[in-house]
């Protein structure tokens, strides 16, 4: 008994140590709440709800795929005063981390397959399960499979995590596939470590999110390009398998402790990360993302990406642009204080952002085990950075409201820092090769909603941190968030 007590105590101390390693919050929850309220939906606690995926249905209901293998239908989740009624459509699945809906059928991505599920007799329960694809192997709990919403052509994209950070133990781990409606499995990319979601970006191009780890210095949003290599070479045995051969020859081995920008110049298939999320400052395990297509019902950020984070229980924003054939962009703080580790988000037509997840497996900031929440715009527009875009001599920064002209034109209100990471086989990376670019000119637009910053010292391949200092709106309001982070893969010509 004494040895058992010692073991349990050691486990508790280890868990506490892990929990202490969670990053700090931004400290902006009170300011954020004026603009976006968090509403907890009253779901029966006996459900032990662990959300893994969402899809908003044509009839106004919400479907939830759960980690416990259910597909639940929620009626009333999108009502102004939510009184949700939950029914079980399907059960007995395994970690439903992707859910789509098309022509009366669900497309569920679970650990071992993509399944098309339908209700033929109309009783509200699934009675037909069609295996669309199970070409990949499965040997370990870490081998998560994430699925996209159903695409306009009926396809589902699946990204497959490795057996662990350093191991490839089953077929096609670390690969991505396009699963067609007739069940074909088309290889798309390789080099994935541990994804957290896959979906189109705001421009309709397929992306996925990756967690920090070996060959990934920080969490990031990556372009899921056909034939692309996402960075982790442990998956290379998959190129010797029949479907892997369709991607062509395996890429060159990356050089350990190099830089991603340099290696992507040497290895044709290797793609730079489109948006780097600085570790702990902008999440620790980013997950689901969706573009805001609500047409302004969710505030001023329409057509931008909203990105959840499991560890810190936060939602962030991201914007992307293509420069010289390479995707890049920025990430921005948005809303902290969610109830648990976010694995799934979804917009409703009414302008709500539904969030849900779990706290099982790894430490999370949120303190609620089973919760379904939604973010609602209060109608009060926050004064915040709207978007940062790269320019040939600096950046163009826009805001959600007109700025005070004096503060907008003052170059001392803009501080920049650039850095990159080791591209290495070890876990994560410190921020390295730091520089301090200088804003030499700030040219406001005539309406006060944007400014062109001329910057001396831009560094291609670096993340550029922004601190916006004493900027004020035309009404004297400070920014809700004073930081943003742009990944500058290419300087526009």
Please state what every model-predicted region is.
Residues 5-19:
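Hydrophobic h-region of N-terminal signal peptides that target proteins for export
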Residues 393-397, 451:
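Structural beta-strand segments of beta-rich domains
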